[in-house]
Amino acid sequence: MKKVSVIMPTFNNGEKLHRTISSVLNQTMKSTDYELIIIDDHSNDNGETLNVIKKYKGLVRFKQLKKNSGNASVPRNTGLKMSKAEYVFFLDSDDLLHERALEDLYNYGKENNSDLIIGKYGVEGKGRSVPKAIFEKGNVAKADIIDNSIFYALSVLKMFKKSVIDKNKIKFKTFSKTAEDQLFTIEFLMNSKNYSIKTDYEYYIVVNDFESSNHLSVNKSTGNQYFATINEIYKAIYKSPIYKNQEKRHQLAGKYTTRLLRHGQKKNFANSKMKYEDKIEWLNNFSKTINKVPRDSDKYVTQIFNLKLEAIRQNDLLAVMIADKLL
């Protein structure tokens, strides 16, 4: 059994793939202990991406999907099916791994019986930012979702124990084109106990490249899809077999609501340049979703968002506009 499978979806990445692949193949971990699984989402760049991957024949495992799926969910699920490793690590095709990433995170996970190991992020270029609060306390062998701000680092660019995924049949949902990585991570967190944070290096480098339009998330989700995903996140919290105490579930839900209000999609929709009818539709979806969440969770929402949260529950656009201006 391999120690780690690195799962990487690709789509029209071309020559830029060389740098990402090299960052995986040049790890300090023994090469026979890990593998790189590349799943191509049916690139249509006249074979440029496939030609790059073919140069690594024998060094990587590769599969191309028969048709384009539109985002990373189907490729990642395909990679999960192919992996038989102890841990899986999800990597975006334009990002980079520090040479010690797999060895350090795996060893730290084994030392602490970790289900999830989160390595510190770094950024190259301007654009996408990375979570910082989660890493402020340095290395944490036994992290807490709330105390260590894990809800603010919900991308899947981490190391997950494969047995937890398999046992609980966790997979990426394909009904939405956004926040599906949040849902995967939340479902994993709600079905596992031990989380570790490693900060010795910037283990995962997010590369900002806005000359490229080939991100797998280029197909945007609708409001209906987005809030359907958010609804599933709350369901996962309230169905957790690990966090069975109802008050703890309320606390987790409240903290996720804070994250949603602080960083969620179109968080400032009420005072944005959206059309009035689009604002009404967005608020309707938001209100329906949040009103499925018990009010007992509201006391755990950060206080500055109380007015906005209540306005959303009341489906009152004017009140949301006023609350936003008071933030």
Swiss-Prot record:
It is an enzyme of class 2 (transferase). Changing R262A: No change in activity. Mn(2+) binds at D94. UDP-N-acetyl-alpha-D-glucosamine binds at P9, D41, N68, R76, D92, S93, D94. Its cofactor is Mn(2+). Its EC number is 2.4.1.-. Transmembrane segments: none annotated. Keywords: Cell wall biogenesis/degradation, Glycosyltransferase, Manganese, Metal-binding, Teichoic acid biosynthesis, Transferase, Virulence. Changing H263A: Decrease in activity. One of its GO terms (biological process) is cell wall organization. The active site is at D181 (proton acceptor). GO terms for molecular function: hexosyltransferase activity; metal ion binding. Changing I322E: Increase in activity. It holds the Pfam family TarS_linker. Pathway: Cell wall biogenesis; poly(ribitol phosphate) teichoic acid biosynthesis. It catalyses: 4-O-[(D-ribitylphospho)(n)-di{(2R)-glycerylphospho}]-N-acetyl-beta-D-mannosaminyl-(1->4)-N-acetyl-alpha-D-glucosaminyl di-trans,octa-cis-undecaprenyl diphosphate + n UDP-N-acetyl-alpha-D-glucosamine = 4-O-([3-N-acetyl-beta-D-glucosaminyl-1-D-ribitylphospho](n)-di{[2R]-1-glycerylphospho})-N-acetyl-beta-D-mannosaminyl-(1->4)-N-acetyl-alpha-D-glucosaminyl di-trans,octa-cis-undecaprenyl diphosphate + n UDP + n H(+). Disruption phenotype: Deletion of the gene leads to a substantially increased capacity of human neutrophils to phagocytose opsonized S.aureus. Inactivation renders the cell susceptible to podophages. Attaches beta-O-GlcNAc (beta-O-N-acetyl-D-glucosamine) residues to the C3 position of poly(RboP)-wall teichoic acids (WTAs). Attenuates immunogenicity of WTA and protects S.aureus against adaptative host defenses by allowing bacteria to evade recognition by preexisting anti-S.aureus antibodies. Also protects the cell from podophage infection. Homotrimer. TarP inhibitors could be used as a new strategy for rendering methicillin resistant Staphylococcus aureus (MRSA) strains susceptible to human host defenses. Belongs to the glycosyltransferase 2 family. This is Poly(ribitol-phosphate) beta-N-acetylglucosaminyltransferase TarP. It comes from Staphylococcus aureus (strain N315).
